[in-house]
Every structure is written in C-alpha cells, then in structure tokens.
UniProtKB/Swiss-Prot annotation:
MF terms (GO), sorted A to Z: glutamate-5-semialdehyde dehydrogenase activity; NADP binding
Keywords: Amino-acid biosynthesis, Cytoplasm, NADP, Oxidoreductase, Proline biosynthesis
Enzyme class: oxidoreductase
A single GO cellular-component term on record: cytoplasm
Name under which the protein is recorded: Gamma-glutamyl phosphate reductase
Biological process annotations from GO: L-proline biosynthetic process
Species in which this protein is naturally found: Parvibaculum lavamentivorans (strain DS-1 / DSM 13023 / NCIMB 13966)
Length: 424
C-alpha cells in the first residue's frame, strides 16, 4: 500500500474495509483456532527476540538523541525479560475462557418464549497508543480472543519495535488459518491516519481505545465519531490512615511510587492522616528521598523534613511519571476522599489502615475505577487481575471501567426461541 501523505485517507479506508471483513470471520472463529493463533504468536515472539531487540534498540537510540523524557524511554524500552513477559501474556490470554457466545442470563416467559442474553464481539476496535510497543501484542491478542478485528496505530517513536512484534503476531494468526487482517498495524506515522480513525473509517470502526498522554486522550474524546474507552492519566493516591502500620505503609508507598514510575498505576500523591503524622510522616518522606524520589509537600511535610520542596496547586493535579511525589497531611479519611475527588483522575487509589470500617468507607466513597485496601496502586493492571493482559484502564463509566480485558471487549445480544408465538 502507498503510505504517502496524500494517500493516507485511501490507505485507512482499505484497512477499515479489510478489518470489517476479518471481523465477520473472527466472530465465528472457534475457540481452539483463536487459541492456536495466540500460542503460535507467543512462540514466534520468542523465536524472533533478536529482531525485536534490534528494532527496539534503534527506537530507543533515536528517542535518547531527541531528548525524550526518561519515563517515556522506560515505557518503550524492551529487554529479554519484557519480551518474555509479552510471550507469556499471549499464552495467558489463550488460556482465558472465551467470552464469545457465553450465556450471561436466560429465562422463560409465560407465553413460552425462551430468552437468553449472550456475549458477542464488538466488531472492529481501533487502538491508538504511544511509546509502549508491548501494547501491540497485548491489544491485538485481547481483540483476537474476544473475536474482534484490531487496527493498531502505535506511536512513531516505537514504530520499529511495534512492527517487529506485529510481524511475530501475524505469524501466529496466519499459521492458525485466520485472516491476516485480523490484527493490522497502521504502516505510517502520518498523523492523518489518526484523524481518519477518529472519523470512524467509513463506518468500519466500532470503538476506539486511546493509550497515551493527556493531549492524545483529549483529542480522541473531542474528535471521535465512534465510542471511546477513555484511558485518562493516572493521578493515583495512597492515603495512609491514622491506624496504618508504619512498616506496611512504607513498603506500599515505596512500591506504589517507585517500582515503575512510568506506569499509569504509579502513585503521584501521598496523603497522610494528621492522626499519625507525628510518627509516620517523617519516616515515609525519608524513605522516599533515600530511594532518590523528589518530594514536594505542604507545610507539614516541609516541617517534617527540610529536604521537602514546597508543593504548588498544580502538583496535586500532576501525573509525574517520574521519581517525584506530592505529599499532603489531611484531616482523616473524609478529607482524603475530598482531596481525591477534587484532584484525582478516577484511576486508582489506595488506603493503608488496620481499621476495616475506615477502609470500607474509603472503598465505597472513592469514585475511581480501582480502589485498594492495604495494597500497592501498581496492581492496577489487567495481568494482575487475572485478565491475562489489558487493552487499557478505562476511567470512564460507559460500558467498560478499570482494566479492559476480553469480557469488556464484548457486547451482547438477545436470542429468543419460540414455538410459533405471535403477539396478541
């Protein structure tokens, strides 16, 4: 296909038509065939590891030269361990129950009609993402397992990596006898391709999932003519309650912030109950600084440790994706919930406390997609939820919320079986 700028519209139209055709076949594909494709793809990823690493090295080198932020470079960097994780994710998705055709509910009517509600694929799913080449495999595999065709538009900064991974995925798709257009990677970095996807590809795109920064998600939400599974920024919080164990709180805070700073589930704000500030605040701040984390805090945090920098109003809204955290002392769980409601992004929040009543209140009143008790926010991940992988963390409330796995990539229809009934 000619991918010159003047031909982007035609290119995307052809991709859309091919995807729609493939989606009809995928909707009827047996579970064994879909699983065979995913297992073969996992084998191909492992077999082609040298090619994938070489492609990724070129992408990373270009990113370093262009001054890309370290957090974004971390997201796009692949190594042997991360590539093995991609292969394992493919195998885990293959092992998941097939949602297509599953009966969600069924009942009989007094007139003898038998009604059942069953899961069906959405159709064609477009995924627009930045930096993370592993999304190429995860998103493609989840769409395939759920009987959907996928159109993947990865970021130009990781184009070579995505192409290398996509080539391995296609090996599995073709080996299993499924259509090559089941998982397509847009072969151009022209931004016009995104615009065409947002228009819906002439009715051939059923839903869009944006995976990227605030500006990308905002553009998709503003311009898309098809439904969007919004994956907003992760301004995630950890609230250390007055009845929190200090050692547990320290371990959770360090993991939530620093395990991987560039993931959307990384904690960006630490809230400490004034009831335990005298005993917990200074040790928590010191532990973060000892691990190389910059701390920006309110007056109480600054008094607890002179190394704390003053926090501005903007800090409470910021997704740093870096070794930086904002710290504030709050007046109990009610104040913590209010802070999260004002400054959070409805992504993931955690409470550390030994008080079950307080925990239950936090879990009930915090209006985020994922809320945890005594666990790190970095568990905000489809794989950790047993979904095999995720296509994103949906922070909206329409159709899907939280990790978007195979079930969330389906809709449903009603099957009505009768014996000649007519309506009076």
């Amino acid at each position: 296909m000619n991918a010159d700028r003047q031909d982007v519209s035609l290119l995307m139209e052809e991709i859309g038509v091919a995807a729609r055709s493939a989606s009809r076949l995928l909707a009827q594909a047996p579970t064994k065939q879909k699983d065979a494709a995913l297992l073969a793809a996992a084998m191909a990823v492992r077999a082609n590891i040298d090619d994938i690493l070489a492609a990724n090295a070129e992408d990373v080198a270009d990113a370093v030269k262009s001054g890309t932020a370290p957090s974004l470079i971390d997201r796009m960097t692949l190594d042997t361990k991360r590539i093995e994780a991609i292969a394992r994710a493919l195998e885990e998705i293959a092992a998941l129950p097939d949602p297509v055709g599953a009966t969600m509910a069924e009942w009989d009517r007094p007139n003898g009609l038998h009604i059942s509600r069953v899961r069906v694929p959405l159709g064609v799913i477009g995924i627009i993402y930045e930096s993370r080449p592993n999304v190429t495999a995860d998103a493609g595999a989840l769409c395939l397992k759920s009987g959907n065709a996928a159109i993947l538009r990865g970021g130009s900064d990781a184009m070579r990596s995505s192409q290398a991974i996509h080539a391995s995925i296609l090996e599995g798709v073709i080996a299993a006898g499924l259509p090559e257009a089941a998982i397509q990677l847009v072969p151009t970095s022209d931004r016009g391709a995104v615009g065409e996807m947002l228009k819906g590809l002439g009715g051939n795109l059923d839903v869009i999932v944006p995976r990227g920064g605030k500006s990308l998600v905002a553009r998709v939400q503003e311009e898309a003519r098809v439904p969007v599974f919004a994956h907003l920024e992760g301004v995630c919080h950890v609230y250390v309650d007055g009845e929190a164990d200090l050692d547990m709180a320290r371990n959770i805070v360090l993991n939530a912030k620093l395990r991987r700073t560039g993931v959307c589930g990384a904690a960006e704000t630490l809230l400490v109950d004034e009831a335990c500030a005298a005993t917990h605040l200074a040790p928590l701040v010191a532990a973060l600084i000892a691990e190389g984390c910059e701390v920006r805090g309110d007056e109480a945090a600054q008094k607890a440790d002179p190394r704390v920098k003053p926090a501005t109003e903007d800090d409470w809204y910021t997704e740093y994706l870096d070794s930086i955290i904002a710290v504030r002392v709050v007046k109990g769980v009610k104040d913590a919930i209010s802070h999260i409601a004002k400054y959070g992004s409805s992504h993931t929040e955690a409470i550390v406390t030994a008080n079950q009543v307080t925990a239950d209140r936090f879990l009930a009143e915090v209006d985020s997609a994922i809320v945890l008790h005594n666990a790190s926010t970095q568990f905000a991940d489809g794989g950790e939820f047993g979904m095999g992988a995720e296509i994103g963390i949906a922070t909206g409330k329409f159709h899907a919320r939280g990790p978007v796995g195979v079930e969330q990539l389906t809709s449903f229809k009603y099957l009505v079986r009768g014996s000649g009934q007519v309506r009076p």
